[in-house]
Amino acid sequence: CIRDRVSVGMFEHVGTAHYQEFFNKVYDLLNDSGVALIHTIGRLNEPGNTDPWIDKYIFPGGYIPALSETVSRVEKSGLSLTDVQVLRFHYAETLKRWRYNFYDNIDKVKEIYDEKFCRMWDFYLSSSQASFEESTLVVFQMQLSKNKKTVPDSRNYMLA
């Protein structure tokens, strides 16, 4: 039985103090032939700080990792990093569409939330889109396995 695991949009909420625990748990959950995919917002440069406004109003306790912060923890867990994909502009487009959808439904939103929330959410979506377009924010997809022979040598298998 192959046990594959996927984590989407969760790793940025784990916190650096728990990275090793996270990857150790991924290792424990995989069979010897299992593969894990970790999909997370990340930064292309060195580790940094979370924007204070984002931390206070949008993602309390969240942290955007640099790839350099994760790889050493992957290695210590016994997992092999078998592939990394860096999606540079995809999430900017996602945020842009979310903002359009937000305004397409603004009357419904205002029935539930006040004006302050609406302004904050617009600011979050707009500033995040700009960050993905103009700064070092990206999305990483890390493919991990216990056994590097489990994963094909190229990405051609994804096209089948």
Can you name each region flagged by the protein language model?
Residues Y19-F22, I38-T40, E46:
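Serine-hydrolase catalytic core recognition
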Residues I41-P152, L159-A160:
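Substrate-binding/catalytic lobe of Class I Rossmann-like enzymes that use SAM or dcSAM, i.e.
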Residues C1-I2:
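Short, small-residue-biased leader/transition segments that mark boundaries at the very start
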Residues Q20-V35:
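A short glycine-rich, Lys/Arg-flanked "PGG" loop and its adjoining helix->strand segment in the class I
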